[in-house]
């Protein structure tokens, strides 16, 4: 008998979901829906103010389990808004229609509409969405895969006095936070409380400070960054949080820090890395890095 219930921390549901994604990657490989790193960000990144609600996680994740308590899949709302995701075990795709109906019944009344994200290789899921009246405006994002084992050692040039450091070598959280929040908050409004909220994402089991990289000026200003989230057991990484200070763009800094991340990941035994781009500029950069595979994502709305 298959049962479903709300997320419950007391039942170690995060650990169940994290292991589920690790195991699914070993089967799906480049056709994954979520990687472990995204789940870690959902659970530990406290920048989203909605997460202060004690019921946030139970209201935004719902699990399907078999009689032995094995996780068969889950529905998850990443940010507590109208966008949701459905993840089934590779041999349990037949559960997708029921899980979709659950999401529509419980979450559609909360918002003006619903939106989910699926990739081009989810053929059965795409058919189910269309049957339920979901439509798509087109491509939303592209995930690129990179074979680190065949990647030549190459360091993009940096301006004089600039260097790349990780968060073991440079622990200036204030300078790093200024870069993360550029465009969202005035520098003088940055407080220790806000820095602490940003720092919670580093509690993810996929986080390793060795792969949290920044380009730093001679004056110690963090001007470009990326983070490689890793699963050493699967020899895989996801690179996220690629940012460059607006006044330092067009200097090749994002390319330099990502290429350095590739090399450090490769040296540690990581064989494959993924980066997802949602807009033209980032996608052009990520294509320049020499991907070995592509996967297109679509938003389906109702």
Language model features by range: what are they?
Residues 2-19, 25-31, 163-177:
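A short beta-loop-alpha structural element at the N-terminal edge
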Residues 6-9, 22-109, 218, 222-240, ...:
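Conserved donor-binding loop and adjoining core beta-sheet/short helix segment
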Residues 39, 154-237:
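Flexible, substrate/cofactor-facing loop regions flanked by secondary structure
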Residues 73, 138-140, 224, 254, ...:
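A structural microfeature
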Residues 78-82, 87-161, 298-302:
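Acyl-donor-binding surface of acyltransferase catalytic domains
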Residues 92-105, 241-244, 250-267, 287-288:
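Conserved acetyl-CoA-binding loop-helix of GNAT-fold acetyltransferases
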Residues 114-117, 239, 272-277:
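Conserved hydrophobic beta-strand within the GNAT/NAT acetyltransferase core sheet
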Residues 258, 279-282:
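Short glycine/proline-centered loop/turn elements that form peptide/ligand docking sites
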């Amino acid at each position: 008998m298959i049962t479903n219930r709300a997320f419950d921390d007391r039942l170690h549901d995060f650990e169940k979901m994290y292991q589920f994604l690790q195991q699914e990657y070993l089967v799906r490989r480049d056709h994954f829906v979520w990687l472990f790193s995204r789940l870690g960000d959902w659970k530990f990144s406290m920048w989203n103010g909605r997460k202060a609600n004690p019921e946030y996680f139970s209201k935004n994740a719902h699990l399907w389990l078999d009689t032995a308590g094995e996780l068969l899949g889950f529905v998850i709302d990443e940010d507590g808004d109208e966008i949701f995701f459905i993840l089934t075990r590779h041999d349990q795709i037949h559960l997708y229609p029921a899980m979709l109906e659950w999401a529509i019944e419980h979450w559609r009344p909360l918002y003006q509409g619903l939106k989910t994200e699926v990739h081009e290789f989810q053929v059965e899921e795409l058919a189910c969405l269309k049957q339920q009246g979901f439509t798509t405006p087109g491509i939303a994002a592209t995930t690129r895969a990179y074979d680190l084992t065949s990647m030549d050692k190459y360091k993009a040039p940096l301006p004089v006095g600039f260097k790349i450091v990780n968060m073991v070598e440079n622990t200036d959280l204030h300078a790093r936070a200024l870069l993360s929040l550029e465009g969202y908050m005035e520098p003088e409004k940055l407080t220790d409380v806000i820095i602490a909220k940003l720092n919670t994402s580093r509690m993810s089991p996929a986080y390793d400070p060795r792969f949290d990289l920044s380009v730093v000026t001679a004056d110690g200003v963090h001007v470009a960054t990326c983070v490689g989230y890793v699963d050493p057991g699967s020899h895989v990484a996801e690179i996220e949080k690629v940012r460059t200070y607006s006044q330092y763009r067009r200097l090749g800094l994002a390319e330099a820090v990502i290429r350095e991340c590739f090399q450090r990941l490769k040296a540690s035994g990581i064989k494959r890395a993924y980066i997802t781009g949602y807009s033209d500029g980032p996608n052009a950069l990520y294509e320049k890095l020499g991907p070995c595979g592509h996967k297109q994502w679509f938003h389906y709305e109702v």
